[in-house]
Amino acid sequence: LMEYLLKNTTDKKERAYLLNHYLDSFKGTVYRQTQFAEYEMLTNKMYEDGESLTADNLSSVYLELNKKYYGSDIISDEHIAYEWARIPHFYYNFYVYQYATSYCAAFSVAHKILEEGTPAVERYKKFLSGGCSMAPVELLKIAGVNLETPAPIQDALNAFGEIIKEMETLVED
């Protein structure tokens, strides 16, 4: 849908809005959920290593990850360190990475459909008809997406980079 909307808009402001929405969706699903998954991994390792899981320790880890993920160009308000305490994803064990991988898999399927047409649509239908007959990673292979390789994630990240470049060009004009 996003590709269709971008292809068919001639209004610069609408295009900027669509690109921003695309980027924000990508950032929130791929980068932020990966950040959350890394936070869970690090805090679980702290526990396994016998470290105390105090609010100060958990907040410190979260703040450092926030700085890592947002980079030095973004000023991190020190209060962001406490955000971990209000994120419901952390009430249940490690699963948020699936948001990022699923987004990249869906991105890959959609782009295969746009590039290949009918053959990719047929593979997608076969994937859908597979239901729960096998593991999701195996079902995705039917659709032409192999999450056991870095390709789907790298392709999505490359596209994200291109969308950023387009947005930068658009706002410079």
Locate the predicted segments by residue:
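C-terminal, non-catalytic "cap/extension" segments appended to globular domains
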Residues: L1-K13, A37, N44-D173
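Hydrophobic transmembrane alpha-helical segments of multi-pass transport and channel proteins
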Residues: F26-V30, N93
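Core active-site phosphate/anionic-ligand binding loop and the adjoining beta-turn-alpha structural block
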Residues: Y31-Y39
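Short beta-alpha connecting loops at secondary-structure transitions
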Residues: L18-S25, M46
